Amino acid sequence: QQNFLVYSGGTCNSRGSIEGHFLALTDFKSINKLFLPKWGKEEWPSAPQNIYAQDEKANNLFIFPNDIDTIYSYNQQKGAVYPFLFLDFHGDFLTKDKHPYGPGEDQEMSEIITKRKYIYSHYSFNQASGKLFFKLVGKREDFCSINLKNNVLYSFNRLFDNFMPISYNPFIGSDGKNLYVLVQEKELAEHYQNIKCTYPAIQRLLPALSPDGNSWILLTIEIKE
């Protein structure tokens, strides 16, 4: 029997919760287990990008839900979800208890986004070579990397040769050892007009790139242990 871990949509009502929970272990015929009781007052379901990251060594999953400052671990053998890491952003992370609700929700949320009052979202959650990666959005716009050997978090705002992609979700996947990054042709062309390229694979691409080009390029970033 094959089981699947399913995300509900994260709301306080039946439209976006599974029997009042965020996650369920199901075979799509019946619910076997429920995880993470719902909290907050969110009424509209959402589907965050990259909510899961695979733990290649243990064949488990890391889970980073939206509006929750905790990364969880799903143990496939035990069929259970456990808190794995609490992320302390010193009050700057917009959790469900700080999220605006009610008649003025749209206006308040718009102000949070435009004035960058909080870290209001995260993207690009992946695992590669024993490290977790994700990108913050809002009050902080940097990338974060967590070394799973010692749980130390590092932040950075450039990927290679001081390149910063404009995409809000640049890490589109991982094979466990490499991160896959999607960038636009004109991004690379413009970036390297005045900066020396130190990567041979990118050097070979540059002559064919145009500052006006709209093609997308898939890059592989090898993450060392």
State the predicted function of each range:
Residues 10-16, 68-70, 139-140, 186-188:
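Short glycine/acidic-enriched loop and turn motifs that connect beta-strands
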